A protein has these predicted regions:
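Disordered, low-complexity "stalk" and linker segments at domain junctions of extracellular
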Residues: 1-154
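Trp- and S/T/G-rich repeat-edge/linker motifs of beta-rich repeat architectures
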Residues: 23-43, 115, 125-144, 176-201, ...
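Conserved, compact domain cores that house catalytic/ligand-binding motifs in diverse enzymes
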Residues: 146-183
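Beta-sheet-dominated scaffold domains
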Residues: 1-5, 151, 157, 165, ...
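Predominantly extracellular/luminal cell-surface or secreted proteins
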Residues: 60-64, 101-105, 161, 169-176, ...
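Secondary-structure junction/capping motif
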Residues: 67-70, 173, 265-267
């Protein structure tokens, strides 16, 4: 039961017993199978230094082409009016700018105070913005029983679903950064997301059907994950059950606006589509007149 999705020459492969991988085609006869590293490509600066010790500072690197921010550097202490200096990262993309964060004494949280194009920054007693904090490294698929079993692209994010430890969860990467699961506190609009498809019982996420909204097919029900007219973010996601048929792990087929999937029980093929009269998605039985074709084929 290998889950997969494709973008151009890159196939993303998932299986509940193995770490996620990509299969990339680099030539007509050249293929590369790689384990996905869930971390930003952009690296933080190193060697932070300043004068004094009253405040703690960290710095991140930012790369304009991808909009990706690194995790925070190692911290350095200095006085509030000193100049902070640091060294550009030795590997990864060359940063276009650096973001500087400061932690007030006994606060415990770093807040944004400014950006630098070069490798120095002078703090002129700037009050940190605690609504804007540096990204925190996160890899939800780092261990056995934490490997996802289904995957799909949706709204410039890569969605993963169903580990052995969390069969009813969905994880979405940062926008446009398909190997980046990092988050900030509080979360930002383009941060990675984690959703639990709650129901009266724990139903395993079997597949995704990315349409105008994201349809999540589980072992016991079909759910609509929507954000209205806005892009997915932590503030606007709604999860609504649509029907209670249940699906197998067999990948659904999308034809126009219809989703064809195999029901989890009963040798039934269903077509799920939007029904105007109920303002929801309903799964109709396509095999009702041809039951004989599906006998002993569940």
């Amino acid at each position: 039961e290998i889950g997969y999705t494709q973008s151009a020459d890159v196939l993303t492969l998932v299986h509940r017993g193995n770490a996620p991988r990509t299969l990339g085609r680099t030539g007509h006869t050249s293929w590369t199978l790689s384990t996905i590293t869930f971390a930003p490509e952009t690296q933080p600066p190193t060697g932070l230094s300043g004068t004094g010790s009253a405040y703690s500072y960290v710095v991140t690197s930012f790369y304009d082409d991808t909009g990706e921010e690194s995790v925070a550097s190692a911290a350095a202490n200095m006085d509030e009016t000193s100049t902070l200096s640091f060294t550009a990262p030795a590997s990864g993309p060359v940063p276009d700018r650096y973001y500087v964060y400061k932690m007030k004494p006994a606060n415990g949280l770093y807040g944004f105070i400014g950006e630098a194009v070069g490798t120095t920054f002078t703090d002129s007693t700037i009050i940190p913005d605690l609504e804007d904090t540096p990204p925190q490294a996160r890899n939800p698929f780092a261990a056995t029983d934490d490997y996802p079993s289904t995957v799909a692209y949706y709204q410039q994010r890569l969605a993963f679903g169903a580990t052995n430890n969390d069969p009813d969860k969905v994880w979405l990467t940062q926008i446009g950064r398909f190997n980046n699961m990092n988050v900030s506190v509080p979360q930002k609009a383009d941060d990675a997301l984690t959703l639990r498809i709650s129901s009266n019982e724990v139903n395993r996420v079997q597949n995704f059907a990315p349409l105008d909204s994201l349809i999540v097919l589980t072992s016991g029900a079909e759910h609509l994950v929507t954000s209205g007219d806005s892009a997915f973010s932590v503030d606007n996601i709604k999860i609504k059950p649509q029907d209670y048929r249940g699906s197998t792990a067999l990948k659904p087929i999308i034809l126009g606006g219809d989703i064809l999937f195999v029901q989890g029980q009963g040798n039934v093929v269903r077509s799920m589509s939007y029904a105007l009269e109920s303002d929801s998605y309903r799964a109709q039985d396509l095999s009702i007149l041809s039951r004989h074709l599906f006998v002993n084929n569940s």
